[in-house]
């Protein structure tokens, strides 16, 4: 159930920038800004576009928000992949986050991994395997298999083992069976004492909904999957968040942002 948290005002303004967000018509809404102290962002499709680039308007918004709110990532990417995609300057604005779909958590100068067992006997020597680890602990690995029959055989055998398997041809990704963005966000909120009513999670895919559903403020980006936009409390792009939320003053950035692979 959606809750109205704004004032309704009458306006005869034409071509106002808010019409792009609120829609055309005589009635438009002036929001009563909720207080937000922490924001979690997905990366692919949320901060980064289809070409893997972060729009400059989003980058500027992140720099602005980082001055007064705690920023965290919540992504299927490993930590080094997220750093490469965002670039060091933007990545360093974040205090940590949930990486590899919950396989690795980074916060308060700590890094915690959910180890996943590697099964070389399943995928063989002919497959291209990328292993992501921290201090020798493997928390995610990906297998590139272009042959469909071979890929299906590997998938079948992997699913017989205690691991979580994601498949988007030609790539197979393996993480700990209990890892998830939702559990990662919950663990960070508990460890850091983050209040749900002051936490915002921003995503673009229906797969992001479980982690978005555990906080009071969920936001889908404008080009998100329709089903996610139906469920999310807000539909806004990252560069519009400051117009609709009141951000608290945060402490200086304190994070661990390096990853061993």
Segments predicted by a language model, with ranges:
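Non-catalytic pre-domain segments flanking phosphatase-related domains
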Residues: 1-43, 64, 194
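Mg2+-dependent phosphoryl-transfer enzymes with acidic/Ser/Thr/Gly-rich catalytic loops
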Residues: 10, 29-35, 182-261
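Short, well-ordered alpha-helix to beta-strand connector turns
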Residues: 36, 68-69, 94, 101, ...
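Residue-level marker for buried hydrophobic side chains located in beta-strands
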Residues: 39-41, 98, 201
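Catalytic P-loop NTPase motifs of RecA-like helicase/translocase cores
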Residues: 47-49, 208
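Active-site phosphate-binding/coordination module
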Residues: 50-134
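Phosphate- and divalent-cation-binding pockets in alpha/beta enzyme and binding domains
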Residues: 57, 81-84, 106, 153, ...
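Conserved acidic, metal-coordinating active-site core of Asp-based
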Residues: 120-214, 223, 229
